[in-house]
């Protein structure tokens, strides 16, 4: 650390122009260096792990980033310092673990280097994890049912709004077929895709129709019942009943009807806004009685078979959960007493995700229970109420979309560089400009800085420094101070501040990503997700940073992280930047569905990865390039082909009218324009980098990008063929 008195003394000599004398003795003491006690710092964000370990290891990184908390049982850190994926959860054997960095290499390396040539950002999906989540939820309920002697079964549905991707929905229908797992729709397009997918599912699987409805929605739902799909129309508003009755009579299709109840039970978190008397959806007890009476008058009371409720996502505790389930169970029993042929209690969503690994019910970022505790609380609450009322136990249905799909999808993005507000060195500050043009008031401010330095009053020194800088800025605005003088003042003040130790140590890591497209919940509702480097975890992170995206928007950043942190432990960028890969985890629900097109940054590339018995343990079974510039332009009603023709004509007009070389140059320009339309909107290195990691994962080689392509990769349906062609 440079001695503060050194550069204050040096600057002082330049601050005494001829004929101008400052009062007081400005003979400074010998240079000294601040001790740790004298340094004003803010180490609140430093963790015990960072402070106490000079030798680093992957296990320490796992603790630092809480991976064993939020990542269990699907994610860990391997001996090489890379994130490893355990596709089968706790049942994953060591040789089945997948090195995430190798998956990124396979996807992003150019074809000439053996990769698929996909551009980052990249979403990596693991259907094996999705399958394990479905099986784990079903097993939790099945275990609770057997243990407690519950006399019915569990039969869940996946709310497709969480992620409507075709392959995710098809996988859920396939993986859940053996235990009658169904789908939930909340709009007409979602209903159409659910109907189509369930044609390949279990005949007993529920198709739950939620959301606001018009005559076309209700007609589709009734047609689905005609197609032998186990469809239930859930009334969100009392008025919907009249449409259901009218259209069912016209189509001669007897409906199965459910009602959504507005419970009194409400949780206080952000996600609890849809619950309680003031909730957006559902019927009050008065409205439910109106529905029962009308169905009874129409001799259709036997059609009422399901009660649905939802007290909000991310239910924090099983106590709150059980309270809501007991209330709903009472309504269920009352409907049976009134003559409805009730069969199903749909407890809605709410099965939470532990985003921060704390296993706490004190915030929206975590929950104080696991799958087994959740299922046990639900089964016990329903059984308790029904047994007291001597009512047959209903089928228990849940809509646990977040818990099903969050873990199986990982967003990978690259940090292209890092910047910090590091003060310039004393030698780089052109101090001679400080002797020109400063007002008497500014020179007096400097006198105060010098005096405070002599006395060792560093707090006062900071105050005088701030005042000195502020005064000089005002003089610059008034035109009495030149830019050279202002730059010298800025450099000197920054150097003083950094030397005392209050300079912000947090770096800004520039990431090849759009927060608005890929992490919209962070921007919209301050939802936090675990973000971790996917490699170099055998090295100690020596920097702290926030993430700044590509968009031209001040909100395009991630500056809040799990654990209440305002910065993230990161590694120093190597070389000229790039090659530092971060993963955002637990974002498989909602993020892709909610993402927008701010600055026309489109969706990321996507790969689907299965665990295999190949030499490297995985197979890429599907790879799709992200949205190109042409794709996102079409969304905004531009026509890329016409745009290209216009620009091509312009190139020929201004670059191709003199000689043969100009014509060639015009052709090169046209080809470059065409390539720009085909490429993704995100940054691309001028030289395509092969992520060919050496033993320490830090060495890369480069090759020509001529073979780079962002074409969609289609793969044969044969598993053996997939493994042979795409295994890494």
Curated annotation (Swiss-Prot):
Pathway field of the UniProt record reads: Amine and polyamine biosynthesis; agmatine biosynthesis; agmatine from L-arginine: step 1/1
**UniProt record, GO biological process:** arginine catabolic process; putrescine biosynthetic process; spermidine biosynthetic process
Which reaction(s) does its UniProt entry say it catalyses?
Answer: L-arginine + H(+) = agmatine + CO2
State if Lyase is listed as a keyword.
Answer: yes
UniProt GO molecular function: arginine decarboxylase activity
EC number(s) of the enzyme?
Answer: 4.1.1.19
The record's listing under Pfam families reads:
Orn_Arg_deC_N
Q: Which residues bind substrate?
A: 345-355
Q: Which residues carry this modification: N6-(pyridoxal phosphate)lysine?
A: 161
Q: Which cofactor does it need?
A: pyridoxal 5'-phosphate; Mg(2+)
- Class in the EC hierarchy, top level: lyase
The protein in question is named Arginine decarboxylase
